């Protein structure tokens, strides 16, 4: 029947897509590249800056290929290009566009660090810096991460006035709560002591009343000694 044949073909097609997805999923999640948490970094003109980059692979790597690229509004270029033979080898640089660039990373001891430093910064160095990694052991799967560098004349001082005010208010509130708690405990202690004194006073007063009224157990009930 045509309907049953079409349904069978559709099932086979979806099964094939599912198997392909399961095959590609480990690859897509294995190789990762990171340039840190900060997506933008600032540096002063004329100084040196470290552009961080690390990678990780669940399947290991052999003859890993890495490179850094620079991209601005009107310029794109490869800054440095190199390879890493294996996990016991340090990266080797094959191409370097600028003498101001130095490879600072190491891949030994599972550091997987391919960071670079850029000396004598210029305002024209402002732009996007992307760290690329391609792993032949994972069917040449490639991953990259980008960080934006902003070269400035001087770093702006962060105004912490608001932060200090907030911390002062929070500290004051906490101090006030502690003070109130201590006062509350002190008052409770005084009340407890006062109640204990009142109780002792009532017991003592009750004993005196019994003595004066000649009640059982009082001194008035005691008989005088018999004269012989």
Curated annotation (Swiss-Prot):
GO molecular function: sodium channel regulator activity; transmembrane transporter binding; voltage-gated sodium channel activity involved in cardiac muscle cell action potential
Calcium as UniProt keyword: no
Keywords tagged on the record: Cell membrane, Disulfide bond, Glycoprotein, Immunoglobulin domain, Ion transport, Membrane, Signal, Sodium, Sodium transport, Transmembrane, Transmembrane helix, Transport
Gene3D superfamilies: Immunoglobulins
Modifications the protein undergoes after translation, according to the UniProt entry: Contains an interchain disulfide bond with SCN2A.
Biased composition (Basic and acidic residues): 219-228
Cellular localization per UniProt: Cell membrane
Alphabetical list of InterPro entries matching this protein: Ig-like_dom, Ig-like_dom_sf, Ig-like_fold, Ig_sub, Ig_V-set, Myelin_P0-rel
Membrane topology designation: Single-pass type I membrane protein
Transmembrane is among the record's keywords: yes
Region described as Disordered: spans on this chain: 198-228
Gene Ontology BP terms: AV node cell action potential; cardiac conduction; cardiac muscle cell action potential involved in contraction; establishment of localization in cell; membrane depolarization during cardiac muscle cell action potential; neuronal action potential; positive regulation of sodium ion transport; regulation of heart rate by cardiac conduction
Subunit structure: A voltage-gated sodium (Nav) channel consists of an ion-conducting pore-forming alpha subunit functional on its own that is regulated by one or more beta subunits. The beta subunit SCN4B is disulfide-linked to the pore-forming alpha subunit. Interacts with SCN1A; regulatory subunit of SCN1A/Nav1.1. Interacts with SCN2A; regulatory subunit of SCN2A/Nav1.2.
PANTHER family associated with the record: MYELIN P0 RELATED (PTHR13869), SODIUM CHANNEL SUBUNIT BETA-4 (PTHR13869:SF14)
Protein name: Sodium channel regulatory subunit beta-4
Phylogenetic lineage: Eukaryota, Metazoa, Chordata, Craniata, Vertebrata
Gene (UniProt): SCN4B
